Amino acid sequence: TGTAGPVRWHVLLADARAPEENDASAQVLVTVESGAGPVTTLVTGDMEEDASAAWVAGHRSDAAAPPRVDVLKVAHHGARNGGTAVPRAVGARLHMVSVGADNPYGHPHRATVDALGRLGPVARTDLHGTLALTAADGPNSDGAPEITAHTVRPPSSVRTGP
């Protein structure tokens, strides 16, 4: 847990004893106090589907289930093995996928992107470049800030050969 100006963060889960390396990655809740109100973001690591489903179902003795948030940084670059349990549970209004353009792993997986798209808007760094978020008073009936993702720097291309 820590703070820096208007930003607070809290590690919700980081399991160094996880049998799978990806499942040991930290899950961090970040809250930014904006002029339009607080914006919560769940920054997920590379936790895979089974561990994510157990977390969401409350089957962890070391962590509460993930909270509802405004923004979700999607697990494992949108890989298929990240699952959709956390995105469905947190009810984010914006899903961000951090992934390199033309990466050799084929991330994000089409099925993951399709599932996220059914839950709400998806911003991807491979398509949209480096992203920044802004929060403004908006038309949201729940009084929550309107969140917009903006491209700060376009995605770069990778060239091989002469």
Residue locations for each model-derived region?
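Cap/insert and terminal regions of metallo-dependent hydrolase folds
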Residues: 52-132
